[in-house]
């Protein structure tokens, strides 16, 4: 990091991927700090650390959600992993639009600053990440905080749209000779399947929050029934974006998991084509289920029946992926190195999150469970243990390629077990709280809920210890790990991997390929 000009103006996909990773790590640390503050407040009944300031509690909730989704998971998963891996995996010299790639990243820091500054303006933005009116309207949040948060969303949305255009163009036009789509690794497939929903859904969000902005500042009434508007319109528009948005971090994660499970089982992925079509199905179906977040707003019974059925159908391609991973492991000689531990943890916990999703898909049950901690537990099992475990797995899998050094295996495994124990202890009790009717976004609760909340808060402290261990692993690897030569890549040579990233030096040269590789072999594993 000695030359700031190189990092500011770089158009190299590896440099920009590294910037995305660093940015994601910083945002992730901030988001984790907010989540620990939330859990400290909820550790016991009554007012604990926020002095009874319920608005501040909701500002923390809002900032935690935005930081984790828009500034940690998405930049690290799509910007970081995508930028580093996709050009190498398809045999391309770089991304299709390198300068667009640069601005895609540099739109994010100002966006983050706008979000953080919104918390410091007057009483902050305590709307939740959904920013639903009338709570986000000018009468309920009169200062500039919500406007600042909306501007932040606009900027990060532009960043994602530009990045998506870049990835789609790169993968469709810049594959090396012989690298057909059906020879591409599954991570390469997962990126355009992620980019298309982003490209289609973000403009809808932009429209919705622009309406909100004009309602707040220019006296329009899109969300105000007094002027002929409807707050439910905003909910439909937001959720049309918001539901594909929650699949967006998971799909590249599932691509990473496919690589890892294949490598450490010593077998090609079971049902490659099925995996591809399952990913595409999830990407398409994600657009058809948004109103399952809105079962309590007074939808027609036939509308609720449709959204219940459509939501349950998403479980089918998801199940295909889960069972294909299990079938890949079946009969393989499995090595439980750190990436594989995270991959198996991902499969197990993502499955639990999916099962609670099936419960919540029932519109009748959701009337009781909506906005309780059951929903919080569900989406954290999918995101906190799906997307984040996939990121950890991918980091340990490719870190040798990125740094040219091996990570300390024992410390990596300790990191896994502490984190696994911590997140489960945090989130599993939330199912019981939700079934008992404890509502979300409220910083105080009756004494009856005290036991499970105390356990949950204790689990969050353990998770922080695990995440600190991760940064220890990163520091040791980047500064003093064993150098990797082509002969001692930890697992690529053992498993005779034929994805392209293992065939270039570690770390890859500034310009990865002297000449474009010609792909003649379609098998992903040779015994």
UniProtKB/Swiss-Prot annotation:
Instruction: Cross-link 1'-histidyl-3'-tyrosine (His-Tyr): give the residues.
Output: 243-247
The record's InterPro entries line, in alphabetical order, gives: Cyt_c_oxase-like_su1_dom, Cyt_c_oxase-like_su1_sf, Cyt_C_Oxase_1, Cyt_c_oxase_su1_dom
Per its UniProt record, the required cofactor names are: heme; Cu cation
Q: CDD domains, from UniProt?
A: Cyt_c_Oxidase_I
Compartment(s) where it occurs, according to its Swiss-Prot or TrEMBL record:
Mitochondrion inner membrane
- Give the EC number(s) listed in the UniProt record: 7.1.1.9
Query: What topology does it adopt in the membrane?
Result: Multi-pass membrane protein
Q: Which chemical reaction does it catalyze?
A: 4 Fe(II)-[cytochrome c] + O2 + 8 H(+)(in) = 4 Fe(III)-[cytochrome c] + 2 H2O + 4 H(+)(out)
Residues engaged in binding O2: 247
List of residues binding Ca(2+):
41, 46, 443
Keywords associated with the record: Calcium, Copper, Electron transport, Heme, Iron, Magnesium, Membrane, Metal-binding, Mitochondrion, Mitochondrion inner membrane, Respiratory chain, Translocase, Transmembrane, Transmembrane helix, Transport
* GO cellular component terms given for this protein: mitochondrial inner membrane; respiratory chain complex IV
Its annotated pathway reads:
Energy metabolism; oxidative phosphorylation
Single GO MF descriptor: heme binding
Q: Which residues cross the membrane?
A: 18-38, 59-79, 103-123, 149-169, 193-213, 246-266, 269-289, 312-332, 340-360, 375-395, 414-434, 447-467
Its main localization is mitochondrion
Q: Which residues bind Cu cation?
A: 243, 292-293
- Please tell me where Mg(2+) binds in this chain: 370-371
**Subunit structure and binding partners:** Component of the cytochrome c oxidase (complex IV, CIV), a multisubunit enzyme composed of a catalytic core of 3 subunits and several supernumerary subunits. The complex exists as a monomer or a dimer and forms supercomplexes (SCs) in the inner mitochondrial membrane with ubiquinol-cytochrome c oxidoreductase (cytochrome b-c1 complex, complex III, CIII).
Function per UniProt: Component of the cytochrome c oxidase, the last enzyme in the mitochondrial electron transport chain which drives oxidative phosphorylation. The respiratory chain contains 3 multisubunit complexes succinate dehydrogenase (complex II, CII), ubiquinol-cytochrome c oxidoreductase (cytochrome b-c1 complex, complex III, CIII) and cytochrome c oxidase (complex IV, CIV), that cooperate to transfer electrons derived from NADH and succinate to molecular oxygen, creating an electrochemical gradient over the inner membrane that drives transmembrane transport and the ATP synthase.
UniProt similarity note: Belongs to the heme-copper respiratory oxidase family.
Q: What is this protein called?
A: Cytochrome c oxidase subunit 1
State the organism named in the record: Glycine max
Q: Which gene encodes it?
A: COX1
